[in-house]
Amino acid sequence: MSVTTVLFDLDGTLLPLNQDEFVIQYFKHLAAYLAPHGYDPELFTKAIYAGVRAMTENDGRDYNEAVFWEEFSHFFPQAREEMHLFDDFYANHFSKLQAFCSCNPRMRALIDRVKESGRTVVLATNPVFPATATEQRIRWAGLVPEDF
């Protein structure tokens, strides 16, 4: 049996970081950004963890994103109407979290070698992050989303 597909983990493998510290900083930065818009930071943190828990318990009945927002909206019913705030955070502020990561330039060469061997390259990552955050973290690793 030959290997046809190689799965790479993003956080901690392709993108070196302390995942626990990164998640703490991520939630802290997002909560601080949203606080002036009526999102109490303490309640916000509880809402995030409740949404993440709902995703981990998702039995496939719906997409993780839908499951997250359904749970999060119990805490902040206005959140779905204020998605522009979240979009702005990811477009203009999420990049500050790159300071909590490093880059291993050998990963670029490794991905290239695997692809040149004819194997399919697949990315695995934490479902906590929306697509835009995942794409940014891929770039922080010195890669591009099209690599996967």
Task: Give the label of every model feature segment.
Residues 14-16, 54-55, 125-129:
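Short histidine/acidic/glycine/proline-rich micro-motifs that form metal-
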Residues 122-148:
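Substrate-recognition "cap/lid" segment bordering the active-site pocket of phosphatases
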Residues 42-92:
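A metal-dependent, Asp-based hydrolase signature
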Residues 24, 28, 66, 131-136:
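Short, surface-exposed alpha-helical segments at coil->helix boundaries
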Residues 39, 78, 143-144:
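Helix N-cap/coil-helix junction residues
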Residues 14-16, 97-101, 107, 139-148:
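A generic "structured core" feature
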Residues 62-67, 79-84, 91-123, 135:
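Short, acidic loop-to-helix structural element flanking the phosphoryl-transfer center
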Residues 1-47:
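Active-site neighborhood of HAD-like aspartate-dependent phosphohydrolases
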